[in-house]
Each structure stands twice: as structure tokens, then as C-alpha cells.
Amino acid sequence: MTLVRLSAAALTIALAAPLTFLGARAQQDTNSANYIMLGCEAFLLDPIPTSKLLVAGVCAGIIDTLQAIKPNICLPGISTRRLLVRGVVTYINNNPARLHENFIDLAGEALEQTWPCAKQ
């Protein structure tokens, strides 16, 4: 009976070992600029690739929300969602060492730096 248990334990370990490697791989941070920038860059394409539609919508939605709630962003009279996304993409691409940072924080900073309000 002991031999059967040892064999079963060895088989379980042998079968589970490859799963450990899958779990050990680093999870991708879906809140990082590195991840969401894929959607922002896809948003600027015409048409947006089907495989990137969801993350492109996430990017545009975050940027729309930020420009609506941040009081220190002063957009030009005529501004489009594409213009806002392009501004954020340009800012983040000019700061590649920060791609690991939270996209919302970085996009908010990008909007404030790209379209600051005049000081009173």
C-alpha cells in the first residue's frame, strides 16, 4: 500500500510541476501604462484592430473621464477624443521609463502638462 501511495504522490508531483511554471510567470499589470498604451496606440489607427477594441475603449474612456473631472486641464476650443489620446500617447512615449506606472495617474499628468490652464 505504501508503494501505491508513493507512486501516486510521485505522479501528482510530476503532473503538477509544469503548472508551477505557468503560475510563476509574472502577471501582466492591466492598470499599467505599458498595458493600456497598446489600446491608446490602436485607438489612433483607422480602423482600430478588432483584437484591440476593448483596451482601446478603456484608454479612450479613461482619458475622457480625466479631462471631464480634472479642473486644471484647459483644452483648445475644438478638441476631439483623438487629439486627447494623441496627446497622452506622445507624453507617455516621451517618458518610456515610466511605462510601469499606473496609466490613470500618468494620463492625468499628461493631460495637465499638455493642456495646462493659464495661471491667473
Predicted regions and their residues:
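Bacterial N-terminal signal peptides
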Residues: 10-20
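Sec/Tat signal peptide C-region and signal peptidase I cleavage site
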Residues: 20-28
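Short N-proximal segments of mature Sec-exported proteins
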Residues: 27-90
